[in-house]
Amino acid sequence: MAKRSKAYLAAAEKVDRTKLYSPLAAARLAKETATTKTDATVEVAVRLGVDPRKADQMVRGTVNLPHGTGKTARVIVFAAGEKAAEAEAAGADAVGAEDLIERIQGGWLDFDAAIATPDQMAKVGRIARVLGPRGLMPNPKTGTVTTDVAKAVSDIKGGKINFRVDKQANLHFVIGKASFDEAKLVENYGAALDEILRAKPSTAKGRYVKKVTVSTNTGPGIPVDPNRTRNLLDEDA
């Protein structure tokens, strides 16, 4: 394990690991325990009571964060003709078809999200092994395979995020920056949590949301009460 910095260790001492924090208290503490001078990213990890090995227990979805992520996503679009023009007008960072695929095959991956029109998916399939493991493969379930490319670009740049359970039944997503006030962080968290709860598989048994941790990308994890799904802006009782 990498040696922790003095700043990290000092921040970790502020976290009481014997308690479960309210989302509001956790957001406040995450801001306090960011250990860099740069604007740290605030992240959430959720452990779910599902078995990702079963196809009917795969949890995935999208959510438009009401306050965005604090970062403007770099979006590419696989499209041609009129749809390519629409994507460019909407602010896509790169638009193309065969040329864009060749660029990615050459090692270029300087983007955060990829969108494709349905007619381009057969071609995009050639780079599925590059995009898939990075969570960048366009998919109809996340709204990234669509004919309405302008809306898809606008949504992603406006703060739309994707979530997908990993092999260990964990979800990871961003809810903003340490510079956000805690209420905005909590409202973003609540929007994501609502979508995760809606995505609960009918075959999942027992407790669905088992563990929640909030942290900055530079600070210690803060345990959050997984049962707090309503009145998230309330303080601890």
From Swiss-Prot:
GO terms for biological process: regulation of translation; translation. One of its GO terms (molecular function) is tRNA binding. GO terms for cellular component: large ribosomal subunit. Keywords: Repressor, Ribonucleoprotein, Ribosomal protein, RNA-binding, rRNA-binding, Translation regulation, tRNA-binding. PROSITE patterns: RIBOSOMAL_L1 (PS01199). It comes from the Bacteria. It holds the Pfam family Ribosomal_L1. Belongs to the universal ribosomal protein uL1 family. NCBIfam families: rplA_bact (TIGR01169). Binds directly to 23S rRNA. The L1 stalk is quite mobile in the ribosome, and is involved in E site tRNA release. Protein L1 is also a translational repressor protein, it controls the translation of the L11 operon by binding to its mRNA. PANTHER family: 54S RIBOSOMAL PROTEIN L1, MITOCHONDRIAL, LARGE RIBOSOMAL SUBUNIT PROTEIN UL1M. Part of the 50S ribosomal subunit. HAMAP family: Ribosomal_uL1_B. This is Large ribosomal subunit protein uL1. It comes from Nocardia farcinica (strain IFM 10152). The gene is rplA.
